[in-house]
């Protein structure tokens, strides 16, 4: 399911999985970024550092035989509970990164496995030994902005983004305590699911349209719900898909065609993530208004190279929010459809759903749905 959803890598987050998981990733060619068990905040004394380094090096020894594993992550969001970054202070300024266990842990892992890159502190964007980003704009930070606020921003490599949408009512009823707790928002489950779709689609396409400029990759959090009361997956705990899966299937395939927009249409891009060129292809777009009248359209031939990002069209800003527009995009070759994408009422960009909580509990690691 992971590979069929267009992903070629994943992140094992703050745990060690079953041996068969790593064997399957080897066979399927799915790359793995692998965390330690360090999450948010732990003691900074030397005794803890020595014990933790010993534990993580055992993990490295156990897993480094797997060719799918391409990166170690020493700590996840260090200082998350003790440091609020400001323009003058970075997450990397926390004690975990500067004092303990970060410096010794990073050095030990680099020495223990010099064949792979090592991230010292995931989410320490400006740290030269880290650099990856986490972005929950419009999600965990839903009360403070909109997911489209990412427009115009760049990230070198994103290793966390996503949105938590509860599963369908029938599945929630399988866990009565969870079902009872969510009573106040049951009528909003469909709109919350739709919001997951819109947010994921916008984020994925945002990253893909900055391929190597500067973005080198992204990791959606999570693929499946790890327990009945956490909802970040695009599959629920019982294995049923949510609306977010549709966004992944539309926007996450190796060959894609995408529209850059916010308040107006900006440009159309083609992306080829394969290591071979597609050659000469026919690309096209059609923009219609709410009556179905064609407002703009074009078709042309273009050569699409291997592992590439290609700008296909620029727009002049005359098509903007305030009216309903539907957009269809496609890539064809010799009569075969290679990729397509659609945006129904393209400027409809829903707000964070009322009733969906904005409070995140760092004790439980999930949102608090008040009874």
Feature map (PLM): residue ranges:
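Active-site mouth of glycoside hydrolases
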Residues: 1-130, 218
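Acidic/polar loop patches that form or flank catalytic/metal-binding clefts of enzymes
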Residues: 11, 115-122, 216-217, 257-261, ...
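Flexible loop/turn segments at secondary-structure boundaries
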Residues: 17-20, 41-42, 78-82, 126-128, ...
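Buried hydrophobic-core signal for structured, non-transmembrane domains
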Residues: 53, 57, 266-272, 314, ...
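Substrate-binding clefts and catalytic carboxylate motifs of secreted carbohydrate-active enzymes
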Residues: 70-72, 107-110, 144-280, 284-288, ...
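Terminal connector regions
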Residues: 274, 315-367
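Intrinsically disordered, low-complexity Pro/Gly/Ser/Thr-rich segments with frequent PxxP/GP/PP motifs
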Residues: 289-324
């Amino acid at each position: 399911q992971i590979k069929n959803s267009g992903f070629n890598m994943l992140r094992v987050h703050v745990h060690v999985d079953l041996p068969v998981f790593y064997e399957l990733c080897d066979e399927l060619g799915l790359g793995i970024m692998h965390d330690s068990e360090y999450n948010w905040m732990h003691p900074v004394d030397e005794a803890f550092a020595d014990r933790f380094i010993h534990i993580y090096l055992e993990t490295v020894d156990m897993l480094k035989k797997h060719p799918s594993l391409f990166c170690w992550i020493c700590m996840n969001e260090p200082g998350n509970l003790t440091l609020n970054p400001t323009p003058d202070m970075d997450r990397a300024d926390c004690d975990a990164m500067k004092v303990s266990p970060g410096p010794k842990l990073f050095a030990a892992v680099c020495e223990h496995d010099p064949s792979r890159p090592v991230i010292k502190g995931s989410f320490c964007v400006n740290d030269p030994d880290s650099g990856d980003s986490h972005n929950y704009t419009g999600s965990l930070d839903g009360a403070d902005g909109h997911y489209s606020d990412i427009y115009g921003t760049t990230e070198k490599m994103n290793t966390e983004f996503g949105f938590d949408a509860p599963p369908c009512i029938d599945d929630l009823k399988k866990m009565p305590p969870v079902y009872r707790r969510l009573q106040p928002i049951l009528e909003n489950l469909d709109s919350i699911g739709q919001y997951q779709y819109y947010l994921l689609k916008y984020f994925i396409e945002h990253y893909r349209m900055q391929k190597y400029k500067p973005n080198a990759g992204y990791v959606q959090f999570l693929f499946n719900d790890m327990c009945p009361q956490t909802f970040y997956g695009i599959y629920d705990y019982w294995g049923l898909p949510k609306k977010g899966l549709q966004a992944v299937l539309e926007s996450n395939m190796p060959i894609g065609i995408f529209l850059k927009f916010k308040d107006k249409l900006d440009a159309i891009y083609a992306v080829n993530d394969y290591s071979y060129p597609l050659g000469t292809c026919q690309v096209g777009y059609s923009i219609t208004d709410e009556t179905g009248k064609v407002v703009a359209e074009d078709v042309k031939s273009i050569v699409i190279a291997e592992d590439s990002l290609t700008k296909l069209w620029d727009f002049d800003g005359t098509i903007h929010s305030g009216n309903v527009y539907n957009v269809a995009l496609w890539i064809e070759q010799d009569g075969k459809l290679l990729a397509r994408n659609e945006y129904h009422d393209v400027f409809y960009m829903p707000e964070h759903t009322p009733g969906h909580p904005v409070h995140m509990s760092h004790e439980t690691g999930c949102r608090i749905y008040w009874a």
